[in-house]
Every structure is written in C-alpha cells, then in structure tokens.
C-alpha cells in the first residue's frame, strides 16, 4: 500500500464508524489516495449506503486526527468528473461483507 499519510488508528476509527452507520463502502480519493498530499491535506472520502450524513458528522468529531474530512455521498447525483476521479484513483478503505444465514 502506498503512503497515504493517515495513521492506522485513524483508518481503524473510520472503519468502525462505517460499521456503526451501516455504510456499504468507504473509498479514499484525492491527494491522499494519489500520494501527492501535503501534511495538512484533507481526507477525501466517498461513501455509499447507510447513514452517510451522520457518518460525515461523526468522522469529523470522533476520529483522533486534526485533519479535516471531505465526505461525498455516492448515492447522490455527483458530477461525472468527480465520479471518474473516484473510480480512477480511489482506494477502498471499507466494504461491507454480506453473510448468508442458512
């Protein structure tokens, strides 16, 4: 994995919040995913499923980083250029795995 400048603890907190808010997927994109970030660059996340709005609030308030987050909801209509960027450079941080109960 390339250097994205985010501590493992913060990634773990993002995953825990994704599970808490029943998200299907969390994708890191932007300068951190590309590896050309600056020390104070924000953390760009694209999310789908669940309660994306509350995830966006909690990720700002409950993670142990001073970095800012920019969260976009993939379930809403987004500009095609932004979607292409997410698909091209995105790194999946979390994806819900479905369990079959027989």
Question: Where in the sequence are the language-model features?
Answer:
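Catalytic core of pol beta-like nucleotidyltransferases
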Residues: 1-25, 33-39, 48-102
């Amino acid at each position: 994995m390339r250097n994205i400048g985010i501590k493992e603890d913060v990634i773990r907190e993002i995953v825990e919040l994704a599970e808490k808010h029943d998200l299907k997927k969390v994708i890191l994109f932007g300068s951190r995913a590309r590896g050309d970030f600056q020390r104070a660059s924000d953390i760009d996340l694209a999310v789908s499923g669940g309660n994306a709005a509350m995830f966006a609030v909690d990720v700002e308030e409950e993670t142990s980083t001073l970095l800012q987050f920019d969260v976009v909801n993939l379930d809403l209509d987004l500009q095609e250029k932004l979607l292409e960027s997410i698909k091209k450079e995105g790194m999946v941080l979390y994806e819900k795995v479905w369990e079959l109960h027989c």
